[in-house]
C-alpha cells in the first residue's frame, strides 16, 4: 500500500469495518490487571525520554501528495539542543489521543548542511507561525513570542504514520510525508478546521496573525529545496515494494 492511497478497502481497521462507526482502535477494554501493571511500572521506571517533552504546539499539516487532505496536529516537543527538536505528533490533546507521526525540527544552520535530495523532504515554518496557525495553547503571548521568533526560522520533516482523517482505526500502509501550510492558495488550511480549533481553545487565528506582525520572518523563507512542491508542483509518496534481503554468512 502506498502512502498516497486515497482510501483502503473496508476492514475491521477502518471506520465501518466490523460493524462499528467508532474511530477508536479495535480491541477489548483495558483490563484492571493491565491498569495495575501500568501504574506499578510508572512508579518504578524513569520514562526519561518521554518526560523530556516540555511544550505542546497545535498547528495543521497537509499531505505532500494531496494538500487538500489536511489535519489538525498536536506536537509534544523535546529539545535535544537549540538547533534540533523532536516531536511526537498526536491527533488531539486528549488522554486517548492517537500517535499519528513524528516531526523533526532543525535550525537553518542544520538545514543548509543537508544535501539537496534530503532538503526536498523538509518544509518551512515561517508562514504558519506568522499567520497564527501555529500556537502554543494556554501559553501567555509574551512567553510564546521568543519561541516564535526562533521557530519561524526552522524547518521540519514530518512523517504521518496513521491517516486518521480517512477513518483508519489502525496505522495502515506506508508513512506519508506531510508539508506545512503556505500562503499559496493550494496550501491554505480549510476555514472550518481553523474555526473548530479556535473555538475549542477560545482563541482567534486572525488576532494571533495581527499580534505576530513583528515576528521576524527569514529573508528567504524557502531556501534550497525546502517546500519543494511550491516550485515544482510535485509531492512525494512512499511505496512499499518487495526487495531482496541482504544475505550474510552465519556466525561461526
Curated annotation (Swiss-Prot):
Residues 22-31 have a biased composition (Low complexity). It comes from Zea mays (Maize). Pfam families: DUF1264 (PF06884). Residues 1-31 are annotated as: Disordered. PANTHER family: OIL BODY-ASSOCIATED PROTEIN 2A (PTHR31360:SF1), PTHR31360. Belongs to the OBAP family. This is Oil body-associated protein 2A.
